[in-house]
Design a protein with these regions (language model features):
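HotDog/MaoC-like acyl-thioester-processing domains
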Residues: 1-3, 85-142
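Hot-dog-fold acyl-thioester-processing enzymes
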Residues: 1-80, 141
């Protein structure tokens, strides 16, 4: 059965810890064409806000691997993204990501799926909630 409102509330185990490093922060800042931003350099850099996507998208793997949902990344469009921050990601943080399905709406052959991914340290400190809206075309319409 494809993803439906019945799946709202389903959550998946947290990802393996990801250690945020100065090198990865610098690499991401270069990809944003912002390598000279002092916030992203030095001895205690913070990660650019959108770096959270690196961690949040890793949590998507469990949802897309769930055979009951019949999801395929090749039939999915990332329509919206929001972040609610408690504090910035810093070099040295060991971060886990846990995904929860918040809302599912059907519009014809398309499922509009809202997911939240809670990023927290391995010590349980909540860092950020990344909320995404995905549009997925079901198999029968593909």
């Amino acid at each position: 059965m494809p993803i439906s409102e019945e799946h709202v509330g389903r959550s998946y185990p947290a990802t393996a810890p990801y250690e945020v490093s100065r090198a990865k922060i610098a690499e991401f800042a270069r990809a944003l064409s912002d390598p000279d931003n002092p916030a992203y350099a030095g001895l205690d850099p913070v990660a650019p806000p959108t770096f959270a996507v690196v961690l949040a998208s890793a949590a998507w793997d469990a949802m897309f691997a769930d055979p009951e949902l019949e999801l395929s990344l090749s039939r999915t469009v990332h329509a919206d993204q929001r972040f609610a921050w408690h504090r910035p990601l810093r070099a040295g943080d060991a971060v886990q990501a846990q995904l929860k399905i918040e809302k599912v709406r059907a519009r014809g052959a398309t499922a509009i799926i809202t997911i939240s991914v809670l990023l927290s340290t391995t010590d349980g400190e909540e860092l950020c909630t990344a909320t995404s809206t995905l549009m997925h075309t079901n198999v029968e319409a593909a």
